[in-house]
Amino acid sequence: MSNSSPKEQNAAADLQSFRNGEPSLTYTSNHDNDDADESAIIDDDEDEEAHQQEGNTQNQGEQSPVRQQQDTASLDSFSSQPSLFVRFIRSTFGFRKTTLTLAVVLSYLFVILVNAAFEKQSLVIESPEPAILTKAWTDLQVISKDIHPFDSKANDEVHDYILERTRSIAATKPYIEARGDNSTVMFNQPDLFNSSSSTNRIIYFESTNVLVRVKGTDPSLEALLISAHYDSVSTSYGTTDDGMGIASMLGILEHLADKKTERPKRDIIFNFNNHEEIGLLGASVFFEHPWSDKVKYFVNLEGTGTGGRAVLFRATDTGIISHYSNVRSPFANSFLQQAFNGGMIHSETDYRVYAEHGLRGVDIAFYRPRSLYHTRRDSIKGANRESLWHMESNALDLVLDLGYNSIDEDLSPSIFFDVLGQQFVYFSLDNLYILNISLLVLIPVLSIVLLLIVKKRHTWHIYSTRGWLRFPITTVFSITFVTLVGRFFLFHDAMIISRNWFTPLIALTSLFLIVSYIGLNFANWVVPIHDQKLAILLELNSLLWIATLWATVEIKRYSNVGNYAITIYYILASLSSLFGLLALALKPRQRIELPEDLDEEGDNTRGVQQRLKEAALKSFSYDWSIQFLLLVPIWLLVTYSFGGLGLEAINQTIQESNALGEISFKFLGAVAVLLGLSVLPFVHKLNAALTVLLAVTCAISSFATLVGPVFDYQHPLKLRFVQQVTRAGETQVKVFGKHGFIEPVINDLPSVKQLKRNYTCTELSDGNGQCVYDGQRPWLVDGSAVQNEFENLLTVKVLSDTNTGKTRYVPFDSDLEIKAVQSRHCLLLFNTTTFHSGNGVDKYKNAPVKQVSLYHKLQNNTRPEMKDNFALSFVPSGHSVDENGTDIYRLNQGIDEFLVDKTEWNQDTFHVGIEWLYDWSEESDGDKRDRNLGVTVRCYYGEYDAVSVIDGEAKRKIPALDELLQYAPVDVEISNLDRGLAYLEQYVEL
């Protein structure tokens, strides 16, 4: 128990409170000079309130002359007035609220403006305009003149144009050759969008690719493939998807054929492929061509948006990605590759086919805005030369670097990103793993060493249990508020992020900073500690150490290429915190003497303490500015760069499923937190005026997010259309989209209102819905109205069937003749009582169909004779061709679907053989029909932007779609739902 008087206790308490504040001078009492426990630190991080008190201390308390003389003598080394210049430097660059606030505001503005400026700069076309760009733009105009899906006459016209262009270019050089490809392929294609699906879809496809080979000077080198597809979907002109890729390839070919261009060292093969949109088939059939045998590397050009910059978002390995560092305007990020791999983006490109065939290469694509992708807004009107040149010039630089140089054999996965479109950074995942391990060990060791030095020298007075919980508690509260508000946005209207991700990002970032400011400022006021920013930096560094450890495990287990930013954050926080510790470790210890008696009454004690504060204010340190510059600007730049890129890529995926919407909002919240996290070490020193501004910004941004239109012309709602024609003459229109948004569009259609047509809407899984109504009948082929009746467009005949119900343990053989007038592709689906294609009653049961055949030669309208009834025993697994030219595919696991694509318009008939086994273990005692095989034949038509001549009168092919396009609101766009825009379906039982 203390024997001191209350006044002594008050003075000691005041002194202790002062010691635990933010002093920077070491002081000791004359009463006990050698007692280390009496030392304390006066922090450089002075409060502005102390500045205000500086002018008042002259008049504060009339002390006795003797006492005043003692105080002055003890502090005379610190009482000299600094020069005007020194005071200017201190007021401008000291750790003051105004200075810090200005630095924070400038950092955020810098990051936003510099990103926009450099993006604009990267789209500038050099002057004069390159000749290959001028020609490529003309090519693009011709290619995207009409909507040209695979099953359209316009598709043939595009094919002929590309073939003519390439042949004319090839004619200028003896080592360039161009040809049309007529290869065929029959293969098993898994579900492209669901890796867990066990569906086996057998596809027969006839190629209409256009191939060009530029022979290199060294035939021993493996060839480079450059690829893009020239077909569009049925509802789009395909200007960006993928006309720009085709036009870029033609421009590159023009450059290679130029008389000033040297012949490349390795062969460069161009694959202008067809039918990518419905199954990546043009890339798949390429491997049936002999030129594919020599190909080892590839560059795939795609378009999943409608302009902007073309991003390199996937690469197979470090060796191949290293060559991208030589392009003139790099734009790439492996974060998108991880998002693609993780299912955040539901699309696929030919990259997948080439990579699965063991090729090494990259995927370059346009990526925004996704809501215009596959709609008629993807047209030449919405395109520009700048976007075309960005893809063409970068692809040209990459192709030249790969074609003229040796290629690194580093096959390890790579992380990569660009810096403002000026520099390209890449390194292997193995090297990142090593770097992370090194940092996880080195940084803690350095921190501990410096902390021990600081503790020994008593230059940082902070208790082991005091002040260390404010950062985690405040951060948890801030993240909780951000999460709650983000969830409120989501539940209020999940579609708001589809139109605009920037406004809610501003709202959530402002909210995070406000809550953090309140929490940390309150903690600093209640329990002030010496150098709070350093304490928070160390805690932030510890948090990032854990995150880096997790990211390192992800690298080892899953080859995750998207978490590289965590390593950057850890490095930045480490540099900033280590610098703070180093500054304390090297700081000289200055001592002042306190009077021996702290128990005198009156204002003497208060005067001494006030003079101590004045002295502290005159010992300035500017290490905060270095810490700020090491941490905040680069952190914000990294976060905004990959965060903005990611949000632009995924924000409109909410229209595809609620699950993707959840991911989008979570990612939005994560970016908002990351944008605020780097400022937390300094946030308690922000000017209160800025917090008011942040509150206003948060309120305005939230209001704009909640009350603004969900969709607009630039960010429309996307609905998907298909029309089914039934044998009974029904013409059902199916419109698919987000549940609740379809009905208003259908309600306003003239045919629905005038004819009082009923429609039914069904809520499907994952927030989607489908509405069905009777639409205007389609006119699919030229001729008479009778020729457009169902029975004259699609007929399915059973030519033979061995399922008599008597044989049990041998395969059944059935032959079908399918006549589909002017349809280029038909899909066969199979079902029994226990199995249905795509929706098996028992998901563990194999499909009954074991073999499908496509006959090209017939004998008396029947297939050629087989050796005996045990056909399955004589056919190898997989694809084979018999002596009659019949394509056969056998799969013992069972075949779920069979898709037949053809290229000849006049070849209306498909002849298909099916061999199947009934599962007799499930034999029913009921009707014989329980042992039958059901076959659904569905044939598609994709042309709509054309007319059919019906009995001498021109009629639009699919008027129901025309009506929907014409009367849908300006903020609604229409895309295709299925393989075509209309289909006919017939069911037979074997």
UniProtKB/Swiss-Prot annotation:
Cytoplasmic side: 1-97, 455-470, 523-534, 587-625, 684-690
Keywords per UniProt: Glycoprotein, Hydrolase, Membrane, Metal-binding, Metalloprotease, Protease, Transmembrane, Transmembrane helix, Vacuole, Zinc
Localization of this protein: Vacuole membrane
EC number: 3.4.-.-
Details of cofactor binding: Binds 2 Zn(2+) ions per subunit.
Residues with site note (Transition state stabilizer): 373
Gene Ontology BP, a term: proteolysis
Main location: membrane
GO cellular component, one term: vacuolar membrane
Entry-linked Gene3D superfamilies: Zn peptidases
Acidic residues bias spans: 34-49
Membrane-side (Vacuolar) residue stretches: 119-433, 492-501, 556-565, 647-662, 712-990
Sugar-modified residues: 182, 194, 651, 758, 831, 860, 884
Purpose of the protein: May be involved in vacuolar sorting and osmoregulation.
Protein's UniProt name: Vacuolar membrane protease
The organism of origin for this protein: Komagataella phaffii (strain GS115 / ATCC 20864)
